[in-house]
Design a protein with these regions (language model features):
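Long, intrinsically disordered low-complexity tandem-repeat segments
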Residues: 16-32
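Generic secondary-structure boundary/loop-capping signal
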Residues: 96, 143-145, 229, 233
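Conserved NTP/Mg2+-binding pocket subregion across the NTase superfamily
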Residues: 2, 98-195, 199, 203
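Metal-dependent nucleotidyltransferase catalytic core
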Residues: 33-54, 62-75, 81-129
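Long, compositionally biased low-complexity repeat segments characteristic
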Residues: 4-20
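Short aromatic-enriched loop/helix-cap "lid" or pocket-rim segments at secondary-structure transitions
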Residues: 71-74, 140-141, 223-225
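Conserved nucleotidyltransferase catalytic core and NTase-mimicking acidic/glycine-rich helix/loop elements
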Residues: 4-5, 162-287
Length: 287
């Protein structure tokens, strides 16, 4: 999730019928009744529900319903934090009456000790966590958007206390990429093709994306600070990141490894001995 500080919407405590920070209807180009409009309206209603409960402190929107509202589209869902008084979080996770008061729920399940994934009857999807103030202070999350907060809520809930991931070292990422290829090809030759596919067409590709970003070859920054592959098709043109050549499927590990190695060699220095080993392994795996 990337951040846009200018779109943060500060809020103060409402009376139960109003929710400051509401942005429904403000997404440029959105259509009434569209998924973006419905998601924002859902969160506005949720803020109003929480405002009537004495133990809720804030509702924080994340990702495309947070500070990156420009990313909202028909395929978006709602990621959010509900911040509550210390000791109240267990009841919020166990009993979703507050969520059902917002919109009818078709299905949900506990996906962590702190939250759930939920499908609403109207087809909207959401993932959320319920955190106490103490828990929020140790949580890693991107800068958020305050949809609603109580009058006595501490300042700065939308900014994480835990430092965001730092900038990785280029040399380290290159080393990880080529060793992912090396290990993956050995596993392919052993017959462990699924794990080989993950090493070559998953982990090594992630490292390549990081490398290209460090070299400034992308348009804009990383979309999601915690998920490297989000939005890469918009960020890198095919001549820079040839995904069709390096993500070719279960039967194409040798071909993908060679293609990825060639991309690396165009942009960074690869240890010659390791490059030779990778090519030799790919030749064996491709036969």
């Amino acid at each position: 999730m990337s951040s846009d500080p200018t779109s943060s919407v500060p809020a103060t405590s409402p009376d139960p019928g109003s929710v400051p920070g509401s942005v429904s209807g403000s997404v440029p180009g959105s259509v009434p009744g569209s998924v973006p409009e419905r998601l924002l309206a859902l969160l506005d209603r949720l803020g109003a529900v929480l405002a009537e409960r004495g133990d809720a402190i804030a509702l924080l929107g994340l990702g495309s319903v947070g500070r990156d509202l420009h990313r909202l589209d028909e395929h978006s869902d709602a990621d959010f934090f509900v911040v509550v008084d210390d000791g109240a979080e267990t009841a919020y996770v166990r009993d979703i009456d507050w969520l059902e008061a917002t919109a009818p729920v078709a299905w949900s399940f506990d996906n962590s000790p702190h939250g759930r994934k939920v499908l609403f009857e109207d087809g909207l999807f959401a993932e959320y966590a319920v955190l106490s103030l103490t828990q929020l202070g140790s949580a890693g999350y991107p800068p958020a958007r305050i949809i609603w907060q109580r009058a006595d809520a501490p300042d700065g809930l939308d900014e994480p206390s835990v430092p965001l991931p730092g900038t990785p070292l280029l040399e380290e990422q290159v080393g990880e990429a080529v060793t992912n290829l090396y290990v993956g090809l050995h596993r392919d030759l052993r017959g462990e093709r699924l794990t080989a596919t993950r090493f070559i067409q998953g982990y090594a590709v992630d490292r390549l994306i990081t490398i290209l970003g460090l070299l400034g070859l992308g348009e804009g920054g990383q979309q999601d600070l915690f998920v490297i592959d989000r939005g890469v098709e918009r960020r890198f043109p095919p001549d820079v990141l040839p995904l069709a050549d390096i993500v070719v499927g279960y039967d194409g590990n040798a071909r993908a490894a060679l293609a990825l190695l060639e991309v690396l060699e165009r942009h960074v220095t690869v240890e010659p001995r390791l490059a030779r080993e990778i090519r030799a392994l790919a030749a064996r795996a491709g036969t």
